[in-house]
């Protein structure tokens, strides 16, 4: 008993040491990603201007022109600088309205606003009021989310927070710049997704068999989703310009970008989260079954995994459908309001692209579930010792 106690105590200590080491490595990776330049810092607009936060003190709406629900013209506001070089000073700010409901805003006294200040030394030339200042609220929301994860899931929650910010940094610092520089979106999209998947799963599981099982299961589904997106995009004649704001890239000096390939890569990236989620669910379920019943046969372990997979797939495919439908709700309302036949709706290129997103992701889930169950049942029943995890 003393020998076994010492043995498992050593195993626990080794596991804690590995988790601590992996946590340190994660922090280093996050730090490196934060410091990596994207290569597009020189393209920043208003480099000769100061960006700051201001408070609206008073508004003059006499120059606004109302045309139905649309407003154009300019709003002149008295403002007070809350940050930046001119903090504490008061000045006049201009809010230009172009008649776009999605872009225009009407400020009121007391609003906190993001402003761009053009100046010549200590002399202010002009102040453009850009948008409501939302950074503080977004930061509070992110911190509340991170705190909830840590309180609820403790160590795993902390690692989940790391994985969340790691994903953001990989997308913003690596994937997006590579796409803008013209690298193959399909190849580098897969590499980026594989890297993120491995790092996220390693943060959740550490380095053990569960990592191998969930990674292999996830990548099988992601690869299948990517393959299906390539085939369907070509078969349905979908151009990448269906992506929101993508066409503007072509008019901004990036006319050599292959938007269709970027669309194919976006399907892979979009499906990776749900695929990874399903793979983790099945991996953890099979591991718990075998850990609590070490004598279970391989076939029964695989069957248990398949049962979990079937139940999870039923909701995960619906999750994808709801997620993509939610982004298209206004478009669907427009089609219905105009009396557009369902035949024409389904044949629309934007709707077809969302169908590819949904079906390719669902096929990825369908591929992930049985393969993960098969791999988990095979690997976890090879040894009787399941205390390592």
What does each model-identified segment do?
Residues 1-50:
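Hydrophobic secretory-pathway targeting helix
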Residues 47-73, 113:
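Structural detector for short beta-strands of small beta-barrel domains
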Residues 272-282, 286-332, 339:
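Helical hairpin unit composed of two closely spaced alpha helices linked by a short loop
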Residues 217-222, 252-269, 315, 319, ...:
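Pore-lining and gate-forming transmembrane alpha-helices of multi-pass membrane transport proteins
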Residues 207-216, 236-247, 281-293, 342, ...:
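Juxtamembrane helix-loop transition segments at the membrane interface in multi-pass membrane proteins
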Residues 143-147, 155-250, 257-270, 274:
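Transmembrane alpha-helical segments that form the functional core of multipass membrane systems
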Residues 99-137:
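Extended, hydrophilic extramembrane loops/domains of integral membrane proteins
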Residues 311-314, 323-325, 329-389:
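Hydrophobic alpha-helical transmembrane segments of membrane transport and translocation systems
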């Amino acid at each position: 008993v003393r020998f076994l106690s010492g043995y498992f105590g050593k195993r626990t200590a080794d596991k804690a040491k590995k988790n601590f080491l992996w946590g340190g490595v994660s922090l280093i990776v996050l730090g490196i990603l934060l410091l990596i330049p994207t290569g597009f810092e020189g393209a920043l607009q208003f480099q000769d201007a100061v960006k700051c936060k201001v408070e609206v003190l008073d508004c003059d709406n006499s120059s606004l022109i109302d045309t139905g629900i649309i407003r154009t013209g300019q709003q002149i506001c008295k403002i007070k600088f809350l940050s930046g070089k001119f903090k504490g000073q008061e000045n006049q700010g201009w809010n230009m309205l172009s008649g776009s409901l999605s872009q225009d805003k009407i400020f009121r006294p007391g609003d906190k606003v993001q402003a761009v200040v053009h100046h010549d030394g200590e002399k202010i030339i002009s102040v453009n009021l850009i948008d409501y200042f939302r950074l503080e609220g977004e930061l509070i929301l992110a911190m509340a989310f991170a705190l909830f994860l840590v309180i609820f899931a403790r160590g795993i929650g902390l690692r989940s927070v790391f994985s969340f910010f790691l994903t953001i940094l990989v997308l913003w610092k690596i994937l997006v710049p590579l796409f803008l520089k013209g690298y193959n979106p399909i190849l580098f999209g897969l590499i980026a997704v594989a890297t993120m998947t491995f790092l996220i799963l390693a943060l959740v599981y550490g380095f053990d068999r569960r990592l191998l099982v969930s990674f292999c299961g996830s990548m099988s589904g992601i690869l299948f989703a990517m393959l299906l997106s390539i085939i369907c995009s070509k078969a349905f004649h979908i151009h990448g310009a269906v992506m929101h704001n993508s066409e503007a890239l072509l008019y901004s000096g990036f006319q050599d970008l292959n938007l269709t390939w970027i669309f194919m890569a976006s399907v892979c990236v979009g499906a990776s989260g749900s695929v990874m989620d399903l793979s983790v669910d099945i991996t953890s379920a099979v591991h718990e079954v075998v850990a609590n019943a070490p004598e279970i046969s391989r076939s029964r372990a695989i069957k248990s995994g398949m049962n979990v997979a079937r139940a999870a797939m039923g909701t995960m495919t619906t999750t994808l459908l709801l997620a993509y439908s939610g982004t298209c709700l206004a478009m669907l309302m427009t089609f219905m309001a105009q009396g557009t036949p369902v035949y024409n709706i389904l044949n629309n290129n934007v709707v077809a692209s969302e169908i590819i997103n949904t079906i390719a992701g669902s096929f990825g889930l369908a591929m992930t579930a049985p393969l993960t169950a098969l791999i988990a049942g095979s690997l976890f029943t090879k040894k009787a010792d399941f205390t390592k995890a």
